[in-house]
Amino acid sequence: IDQAVFVGHDWGALVVWYQPLLNSDRVLGLANFSVPFLPRPPIDPVVLMEQANGPEFYIVHFNRQPGVAAAAFADNTRRFLSNIYRTNVWHDTDENQPSGMSIVDMARIDVQRGDLMMSEEELDVFVSAFQHSGFEAPCNWYRNFSRNWELTSGLEHRVEHPALMIYGRYDMVRPVDMSDSVADLEIHT
């Protein structure tokens, strides 16, 4: 296949947004869910996230304390996955939210907001897979943000290919104006 339309969701959207910048001739178009195109910041994004969100923000935590989160997730894989794969969280009140919660706390707390977004049998599949493979590799994606930032220093950070951006009504990521960065953009919520 010489050319394709690339589709991404969440951190996969970050990969897809950069495809036309890195491999323009291979891209017919893009479709992304949840995460908008974010032009390269002037400083290392991990430093920027730490300044904006503090040391317990999950991406900062993965970079500043390698291995800690992965070990905590592995200690109780079922609890961790059950705590993060939730829906209807916005219906719950803030009084049930532990204060100062970090990503590591998601592996340790018993307070579960909202509803599990899958059956217990479906959760078993995820638990089994992560018990087999562990969490180090997924955490490594976030530890590569600084390196990706370095590697993209010489790129023009403007997407010229046709792009579709879809936000979920209850996404944590809110729509942003990408008109200066994405030339041919259609947005749906």
Model-found features: residue ranges?
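Flexible "cap/lid" subdomain of the alpha/beta-hydrolase fold that forms the substrate-access gate
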Residues: 1-7, 11-189
